[in-house]
Amino acid sequence: MLKVESLYYTYPDGHEALRGISLTVHEGEKLALVGANGSGKSTLLLHIAGAVKVQQGRITFRGQESQEVLRKNIGLTFQDADDQLLMPSVVEDVAFSLVAGGMSRSKAHERARAILDSLGISHLAERPPHRLSGGEKRIVSFAGVLAGEPEVLALDEPSSALDPRARRRVIDFLHKTKHTIILATHDLDMALDVCTRAVILSEGSVACEGTLPELFTDRKILEANGLELPLRYS
């Protein structure tokens, strides 16, 4: 479904963020991208979602190599949900991309409310985003992405700054959705709860990959890549 081949990326300051990364994501799969801070997870996710232009290498979605195809089919959420919640109300935030794409305001709001209802948060529709809890903001950010009807959800640290209850709510959503998921996280316990396969990144390269939970029970592999055993195995 999605293939990354020999992907390199260097920032203007000379930092090599990605060094020849290759990986494949299969349709319906829930894949974890894990690694220590600075391993390249977020940069890779931005490329996969078409938010950053490829410098060297290629990314194809269903055989098509196009930044526009990636943007259309892969929905990206940022580590900080506040970066996606900029409108006066939740329903306006969720409807924003639809209105920007040419849909009438009334129809966009109708669709946005249907999405909020499907996620069990229709009661938040008129609430200002800045008055939401961390967990509510995260789910609303998912709603905004779902409005674009992507085939793949690319999620950057979705458990960041969440309390246990909010974290559980996010995990429940990820369990229920039928979308293909690429989950970039350092939260190995969340990866175990959601994903069946993981790719470990280290200094911009693929260090290893494997199935879960097997990969995350190997202390030597995890420690070699700056990671610790998940809490459930500690």
Question: What are the residue ranges of the model-derived segments?
Answer:
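Conserved beta-strand-loop-alpha-helix hinge in the C-terminal portion
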Residues: 205-228
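Conserved ABC transporter NBD signature motif
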Residues: 56-70
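Conserved ABC ATPase "signature" region
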Residues: 106-124
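Conserved ABC ATPase signature
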Residues: 128-132, 136
